From Swiss-Prot:
Binding site for ATP: T30, L31, G32, P33, K51, D87, G88, T89, T90, T91, G415, D495
GO CC annotation: cytoplasm
Keyword Cell membrane: no
Protein name: Chaperonin GroEL
Record note on quaternary structure: Forms a cylinder of 14 subunits composed of two heptameric rings stacked back-to-back. Interacts with the co-chaperonin GroES.
GO MF term list: ATP binding; ATP-dependent protein folding chaperone; isomerase activity; unfolded protein binding
Catalytic reaction(s) noted: ATP + H2O + a folded polypeptide = ADP + phosphate + an unfolded polypeptide
Localization, UniProt: Cytoplasm
A Pfam family reported for this protein in Swiss-Prot or TrEMBL: Cpn60_TCP1
Source organism per UniProt: Shewanella woodyi (strain ATCC 51908 / MS32)
Gene3D superfamilies: GroEL (3.50.7.10), GroEL-like equatorial domain (1.10.560.10), TCP-1-like chaperonin intermediate domain (3.30.260.10)
Recorded family membership: Belongs to the chaperonin (HSP60) family.
Major localisation: cytoplasm
Protein encoded by which gene: groEL
């Protein structure tokens, strides 16, 4: 086992603080509408230019192992804030740095670290409760657009496109972000339920100009098995011929004689029909077939529940207003299922998603939920260069997370104002000694740090701005974007409550651990072994005769 180096007390804390400061100073320059860029070196390709706090934090590794421990702990703050709310990473880093700096000063002055931590924790609990009181619901499209704009570093086009996407697919809908091909951002909305399975035969195509199958008001047959014998389908096809309506078959597979007969019937115009494979595999396929059944008001024909295809009737079929099938995917528009059953299914999937421990499963469950709830929106990010594309895509993803957080827990005044107002209301938190009281004071001072940093990044004197804001009341604050003071909510400067709350809680949690650190243990660097002696190569002198090779 390698030898270890151990630092105690103040020596450990000084090293740790140095690491915290390196990381936090690199991250905090990105805060606010006038935040600066940070350029990240990449081992291949162009350097990455970003204003995303967590992207900067993830890149930082320090040579000194003890300083690096401090930096890694603050990196954890940024990562946790990002995981919980998808934004607020820079705010969390600034808060953590402020709490650690003041806390370590107090420890050096002889205060009890444990009591300081208790005081900080009490202040944070009171602050979170007060934030919830200040929070306002974020319901209308305009407020959602404003939240997105602020999170995307004041880019209004990003805020607006996210608000439009949410309006079209609903609050539960899936919104994904992709790299686009154009210079401008684009929004693609797939209404209805789409799954990635195309037609089983090109002979089903009835729209040659688009290479697709379009069925108006079709019946939909859902079968959880392979269909290869046409006799199983005859009762359904005979019933359909009388109605004159088209049929979509969704089955594990349709093959052989069954597929050939369907193609012939379709080409002769006897029955308008198309067949596709069911989406997914195994248990997920069964679940998705059930989703389609609920959406269209049909029943899944499955032998394991005692239903046979030969005995199926038109009552077992689902219906929809329209179905569009391309070679790659199928879209069912306006299924005629009962709305209360659809809502119950969405609620059931939501519970499964919350309980799931796998990110992949969670993502797939959310997709299923969105397809039932309203649709899927894809934001295609446009840019002139690859470097700009990557930077912009990261901002769009941040803004999307922030708007989801705003819809979930509401919004508070942005620009660091909410934390300043909270600090003024919780100054009299109950404590049992002077050291705890000082812990509360440390937390209250730290709550001003985001506002001060926004002002500093905008080129203003932070103390003057902080005083002006503290002298105001309610939502009165400083708009660094245009260097004015006023009501932050009226100016459209909003922060999601969840983002502000998460940033404060995670910053205080990690900072509290750092203040109460008394020793640090790291490996002693090993000297690299020297290269082997090349003395045995002396006999190579005889190579001189090689000159004749020229």
């Amino acid at each position: 086992m390698a030898a270890k180096e151990v630092l105690f007390g103040n020596d450990a804390r000084v090293k740790m603080l140095a690491g915290v400061n390196v990381l936090a100073n690199a991250v905090k320059v990105t805060l606010g509408p006038k935040g600066r860029n940070v350029v990240l070196d990449k081992s291949f390709g162009a350097p990455l230019i970003t204003k995303d706090g967590v992207s900067v934090a993830k890149e930082i590794e320090l040579e000194d192992k003890f300083e690096n421990m401090g930096a890694q702990m603050v990196k954890e703050v940024a990562s946790k804030a990002n995981d919980a709310a998808g934004d607020g990473t820079t705010t969390a880093t600034v808060l953590a740095q402020a709490i650690v700096t003041e806390g370590l000063k107090a420890v050096a002055a002889g205060m009890n670290p444990m009591d300081l931590k208790r005081g900080i924790d009490k202040a944070v609990v009171a602050a979170v409760a007060e934030l919830k009181n200040l929070s306002q619901e974020c319901a209308d499209t305009n407020a959602i657009a404003q939240v997105g704009t602020i999170s995307a570093n004041s880019d209004e086009t990003i805020g607006e496109i996210i608000a439009t996407a949410m309006e079209k697919v609903g609050k539960e809908g899936v919104i994904t972000v992709e790299e686009g091909q154009a210079l401008e951002n684009e929004l693609d909305v797939v209404e209805g339920m789409q799954f990635d399975r195309g037609y089983l035969s090109p002979y089903f195509i009835n729209k040659p100009e688009t290479g697709s199958v379009e069925l108006e008001s079709p019946f939909i047959l859902l079968v959880d098995k392979k269909v290869s014998n046409i006799r199983e389908l005859l009762p359904i096809l005979e019933g359909l011929a009388k109605t004159g309506k088209p049929l979509l078959i969704v089955a594990e597979d349709v093959e052989g004689e069954a597929l050939a007969t369907l193609v012939v019937n379709n080409m002769r115009g006897i029955v308008k029909v198309a067949a596709v494979k069911a989406p997914g595999f195994g248990d997920r396929r069964k679940a998705m077939l059930q989703d389609i059944a609920i959406l269209t008001g049909g029943t899944v024909i499955a032998e394991e529940i005692g239903l046979e295809l030969e005995k199926a009737t038109l009552e077992d079929l689902g219906t929809a207003k329209r179905v569009i099938i391309t070679k790659d995917d199928t879209t069912i528009i306006d299924g005629t299922g009962e709305q209360d059953q659809i809502q119950a299914r969405v609620a059931q999937i939501k519970v499964q998603a919350e309980e799931s421990t796998s990110d992949y499963d969670k993502e797939k469950l959310q997709e299923r939920m969105a397809k039932l709830a309203g649709g899927v929106a894809v934001i295609k990010v446009g840019a002139a260069t690859e470097v700009e594309m990557k930077e912009k895509k990261a901002r769009v993803e941040d803004a999307l997370h922030a708007t989801r957080a705003a819809v979930e827990e509401g919004v508070v005044a942005g620009g660091g104002v909410a934390l300043v107002r909270v600090a003024s209301k919780i100054a009299d938190v109950e404590v049992i000694n002077e050291d705890q009281k000082h812990g509360v004071v440390i937390a209250l001072r730290a709550m001003e740090a985001p506002l001060r940093q926004i002002a500093t990044n905008a080129g203003e004197e932070s103390s003057v701005v902080a005083n002006n804001v503290k002298n105001g009341s309610g939502n009165y604050g400083y708009n660094a974007g245009n260097d004015t003071y006023g009501d932050m909510l009226e100016m459209g400067i909003l922060d999601p409550t969840k983002v502000t709350r998460s940033a404060l809680q995670f910053a205080a949690s990690i900072a509290g651990l750092m203040i109460t650190t008394e020793a640090m243990v790291g490996e002693v660097p090993q000297e690299a072994a020297g290269a082997p002696d090349m003395g045995g190569m002396g006999g190579m002198g005889g190579m001189g005769g090689m000159g004749g090779m020229m």
